[in-house]
Amino acid sequence: MRVPYETMLAEFERVLKKYGFSAERAHEAAEIFAQNSLAGVFSHGLNRFPRVVEYLRKGEIDPAAEAVCTASFGAMERWDGQRGFGPLNARHAMARAVELAHQFGIGMVALGNNNHWMRGGTYGWQAADAGCIGICWSNTCPNMPAWGAKDSRIGNNPLILAVPRASGEHIMVDCALSQFSYGKLETLRLAGKQLPVAGGYDENGQLTTDPAAIEKTCRMVPIGYWKGSGLSILLDMIGTILTGANSVAKVGTFGDEVGLTQIMIAIDPAKFQSADLTDAVIDAIAADVAASEPAEPGREVRCPGMGEHRSRKENMELGIPVAEEKWAEVLAM
């Protein structure tokens, strides 16, 4: 089943207005969810929307709260998200980081006490659309064991790196520090599919490709094993230092995944060189990667983010594929 983009956008907007968003903020927030689905990231679009509505019902998200700057020093600012709607606070924080980058060459906003930002790639792409290199990350609740541990005490803290192209076909890595995000596990489970490689442990402590088994144990495998574990810990430390807000351990005491710590960094390469030269560098590296001999005959080797352009085009033309039970849930709200 496919749903037109404008139809999905309108339904998200309708529901958000019902739960206290102003017309302007409802449209901007709905656009983030619809754009994520358009890009093929259903785990942080349609599939995640009902959970956000549940947080609104429970009062975990204040639809009217907006992030405020609490400290500023040159190219750096510290913001308090005031437990508002995560994606809007994150979008505004990255917009400010871009402003600072255009002024100073680099800009950073440390956003504390925010709620889930949905898809982190939204903000990397946002920076790239403004001609900037985007770097951002968020911590999470404790949802992954540190390497060598059984119990979950670290987060699968998503990390995003994006580089701009004048064409808009940016190159971007958007990855949780677990082998798969929980959203991806849900998407594959709903589709009745297994993971392509082991992503976590089952109740017997065995590596498994069954998404439902991993969701049950909450024992995911960090990317790169000990390397992903270490990266998760350091991102949490850096973010908590810069925001003065909540660590993964502290978030774990809140009951729900709220009050998160997020870092937005934008770098303006135009301070060093022209956009044409930046494009030439990116194009040369991308072409070299694409010239790789594929491990499987006929399979394309490409840079991260390039599949998103195709998904956007196809889904805008044909409609966005949806899990029917999730779409029905939204229509009933």
Can you annotate each of these PLM segments?
Residues 144-213:
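Phosphate/diphosphate-binding glycine-rich loops and adjacent basic-rich segments that engage nucleotide
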Residues 2-3, 8, 18, 242, ...:
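Catalytic-core signal marking the mid-to-C-terminal active-site face
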Residues 154, 158-161, 176, 230-246, ...:
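N-terminal nucleophile
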Residues 193-251:
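Secondary-shell segments that build the walls of catalytic and ion/ligand-binding clefts
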Residues 45-100:
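Active-site cofactor/substrate anionic-group-binding motifs, chiefly glycine-
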Residues 2-3, 9-29, 34, 42-60, ...:
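Acidic, glycine/proline-rich low-complexity segments that act as flexible tails and inter-domain linkers
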Residues 77-166:
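A generic, well-ordered mixed alpha/beta core segment in the N-terminal half of proteins
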